[in-house]
A protein has these predicted regions:
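N-terminal and secondary-structure boundary signal
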Residues: 1-236
Length: 236
């Protein structure tokens, strides 16, 4: 089995490393554990950047931009993905995809296979690790989080041909130093993921508890196909 996990361990009493190891044990030698390892702090086109420079003078924002950390797949921590994601990313033998904004980290037999290809122009599309997980019919486990963070739904945005926009971020050069790179991809929009998830939850997920908090388990293919139908019908 291949398992994509989103987890917030806050208020669960669960510890990241023991949970990671328990999941790997359940998956077995042939299984693969995947987590998002996203990074927003190296981009000047992200909502988090706009929030941080709001109220700054042009000089202050330019100085802030110049000091932004460059993405390095080997060392840059994930941001806002939680302790479990970091415990996977930093584990011995972990693999990380190369995208400077929406990388994934994985452990297990097919980790390198799933994360080998991740072009700039496909944050979470068919050519990304998410697309590979969809084709492999992976499962999703969400612990103590809601559908508004369900990464799988983003793949449906590519299938419904969402409009494009420009992205820009700073990355580490192989020989040292840093450089800014600009590229086009679809405009990712998670504002209606809660509603998409509420409609999906009727009969398409298994519910339980981990650490006394809600847990959901479902097929990534069923989630993406549902989101594609929902977006086709309801997004303008």
């Amino acid at each position: 089995m291949t398992l994509l996990v989103h987890a917030s361990l806050r208020s669960t009493g669960l510890q990241a490393e023991p949970l990671r190891d328990a999941l790997l044990e359940v998956l077995g030698e042939d299984g693969t554990l995947v987590v998002p390892a996203f990074t927003a702090d190296n981009s000047d086109t992200s909502p988090s950047y706009r929030a941080r420079v709001r109220g700054m003078t042009p000089e202050q924002s330019a100085a802030f931009r110049a000091e932004m950390p460059a993405f390095d797949a080997a060392t840059t921590p994930s941001q806002g993905m939680g302790r479990l994601a970091e415990s996977v990313r930093t584990a011995e033998g972990a693999v990380r995809s190369a995208h400077p904004q929406t990388s994934f980290a994985a452990l297990g037999r097919r980790a390198a296979e799933f994360l080998a290809v991740h072009p700039l122009t496909s944050h979470l599309g068919e050519d990304s690790p998410l697309g590979a997980l969809y084709r492999a019919r992976a499962q999703v486990l969400m612990i103590n989080v809601d559908f508004d963070v369900c990464t799988a739904f983003h793949l449906a945005e590519y299938k419904t041909r969402a409009p494009a926009r420009t992205y820009r971020c700073v990355v580490q050069r192989p020989g040292g130093g840093k450089e800014w790179t600009e590229y086009e991809d679809i405009e990712l929009d998670d504002s209606d993921f809660g509603a998409i998830g509420a409609a999906f939850a009727w009969g398409m997920e298994q519910k339980g508890q981990l650490g006394g908090r809600p847990a959901r388990f479902f097929s990534i293919k069923e989630a993406v196909d549902h989101a594609e139908r929902w977006m086709t019908e309801k997004r303008c």
